[in-house]
Amino acid sequence: MRVDRAREAALDALAACRRNGAWIDGALKQVLKRDGLSGRDAAFASRIAYGVMQSRIYLDRCLARCLTQRPEKLEPLLLDILRIGAYQIFLMDKVPVNAAVNEAVEMAKAHKLSRAAGLVNAVLRNVDRKRGEPLAFADEFEALSVQTSHPRALVERMVGLLGAEEAEAFLRADNEPVPTTIQTNTLKTTAKQLRASLEDESVTVEPHPWLADCFTVSGTGDLEGLRAWREGWFTVQDAAAKLTALAAAPKAGSFVIDTCAAPGGKSFAMAMCMEGKGHILSCDMEEHKLRLMEAGAERLGIECMEVRLADGRVCDEALAEKADVVVCDVPCSGLGIIRKKPDIRYKDMASLAGLPAIQSAILDNASRY
């Protein structure tokens, strides 16, 4: 039996995160491109990869009661296969249990884990049988940690900050589906033309409820395979990023400094507000991110944007009091975008301690421009 390509792509993306410390969005993007997956296959692979990353703690607890050893003691690849199977059983109603189990068994065989194929079959069948049995928890923190798949340290932090009721709502919201929002590149096309092009390729398109020239889209896991993407007719952008440009309201001919610009979305939105006229200086500390921004600007036909390697904490005296608009999307914990980047929840909370000082230094410096 041939292994399903979409499930295999999800497994490869999860393995890249585990081995290389990659983020799931970037890892998945590379795998989909490598394997030439698009449309429903890409969407299915994305659902599984994001879902397993998002629900890992819950899945491991469900697997643990069907194993004779702790899940983390298993070979990592085998554990990922079990997680993929369990995710489909618990959280993908449209996937038949037999299909989820059989595909997991075939993946184990394909990766030379033949001896484990029987284990995969037995464990996932047992997982299905025990679906209706409640899990046991030591206290309310553990219950919330497992039920929402957030590390206990993060649960305790959020309860301390928000109180139990609001923290639970916050953590559960992290697991809600993420709408994909795109902005029409008004430098190249119109919202009407963009929508028609997307619908011609069977993408489901809905106007954004309160942002002009923006849409929410679904029905494809690989936006970069679309004609409209190749033509530079749109960019993927959260509503919050678009609102930043609208609030700043740069005019045609403005000089804008974007101090922490990568991956470039806010700079792109500013360029569209400015009708492509003026000068946007988009800065970042990592050279490979500059190349990504340059490629994005080229695809979108943005010629008023200059990228520069720069530390936002260090003032360029030549720019003092020269800017009409300064944008500072300072480095942050990312806890507010876990819904979009589920792997952030597994960050070590201690690593966040130095962020306020960095943020303050960047803002102090930017105020001089």
Model-assigned labels for residue ranges:
Residues M1-Y369:
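S-adenosylmethionine
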